[in-house]
Amino acid sequence: MKKSVGLIGNTGRMGGLLTEALRSHPRCLLGKGFSRRSQTLLKEVVLENDILIDFSAPEVTETLMDILLVTPKPVIIGTTGFSDNSVIRDKLSLLSEYVPVIFSPNMSLGAYVQRRLTACAAKLFDASYDVRILETHHRTKVDAISGTALSLAEAICSAKKDHFGDEQEPCIEMFGSRVGNIFGEHEVSFVGKNERFVIRHEAFSRQTFSDGVLIILRKIMEERLPAGYYTSDVLYESLFQEVVFD
């Protein structure tokens, strides 16, 4: 039986891509969606769909959480810009006790591989190496530093703490740029006295983010994910283990 999927932010750039993808999806039905300009109420979208995908704005996401806490449904959240909003994060955590909640600022496979390689590199390059993260996006992107860049910094800090303990807290330089129509570039550099090691990911189109959402959507349906808080990294991990340790 096909699952009905509702898009929150369905008139945005990502919403438009996902709308087209879901219309031809073999296992999903494109249900009612929501945008700030639509006549449909957000509560109505939640009630009439089996799974929700949210690419909206922080204030919309917070309202969505309030509704889902009353009527829990699995949700995939790609909205960015609320990394410092503990209220939304607390609501995500509470909702995850009842249904699968998947949150990721960048759901592309390439972004996952970059974070994985960055964490590995952070354990190999000690405190004698400086760390820098550069991120560039289109001029209309609101949040800076990007959620993806912040997740890279978190991966570095976590990896270094696991490997070196509290004795080596990294100092990370972070820079963001908003120019042109660039979909997303993220570069992590480990710079030593005699060498520089760079891990770089560049998205050529938003299609790579849409493809990642569809991979995660398939996992929700095929693997019957239990209630819990997930990131795209967690869901991609089985693929990484299969490739690396096969």
UniProtKB/Swiss-Prot annotation:
Domain of life: Bacteria
Pathway where it operates: Amino-acid biosynthesis; L-lysine biosynthesis via DAP pathway; (S)-tetrahydrodipicolinate from L-aspartate: step 4/4
Keyword annotations of the record: Amino-acid biosynthesis, Cytoplasm, Diaminopimelate biosynthesis, Lysine biosynthesis, NAD, NADP, Oxidoreductase
Binding positions ((S)-2,3,4,5-tetrahydrodipicolinate): 138, 147-148
Residues annotated as catalytic: 137, 141
Top-level EC class as recorded in UniProt: oxidoreductase
PROSITE patterns from the UniProt entry: DAPB
Main location: cytoplasm
Residue positions binding NAD(+): 9-14, 78-80, 104-107
A molecular function GO annotation: NADP binding
Binding site for NADP(+): 36
Keyword Transit peptide: no
Pfam families: DapB_C, DapB_N
GO cellular component, one term: cytosol
GO biological process: diaminopimelate biosynthetic process; lysine biosynthetic process via diaminopimelate
Catalytic activity: (S)-2,3,4,5-tetrahydrodipicolinate + NAD(+) + H2O = (2S,4S)-4-hydroxy-2,3,4,5-tetrahydrodipicolinate + NADH + H(+); (S)-2,3,4,5-tetrahydrodipicolinate + NADP(+) + H2O = (2S,4S)-4-hydroxy-2,3,4,5-tetrahydrodipicolinate + NADPH + H(+)
Keyword check for Lyase: no
PANTHER family: 4-HYDROXY-TETRAHYDRODIPICOLINATE REDUCTASE 1, CHLOROPLASTIC-RELATED (PTHR20836:SF0), DIHYDRODIPICOLINATE REDUCTASE (PTHR20836)
Function: Catalyzes the conversion of 4-hydroxy-tetrahydrodipicolinate (HTPA) to tetrahydrodipicolinate.
Similarity comment: family membership: Belongs to the DapB family.
Protein's UniProt name: 4-hydroxy-tetrahydrodipicolinate reductase
Species name: Chlamydia muridarum (strain MoPn / Nigg)
Lineage: Bacteria, Pseudomonadati, Chlamydiota, Chlamydiia, Chlamydiales
Gene, per the UniProt record: dapB
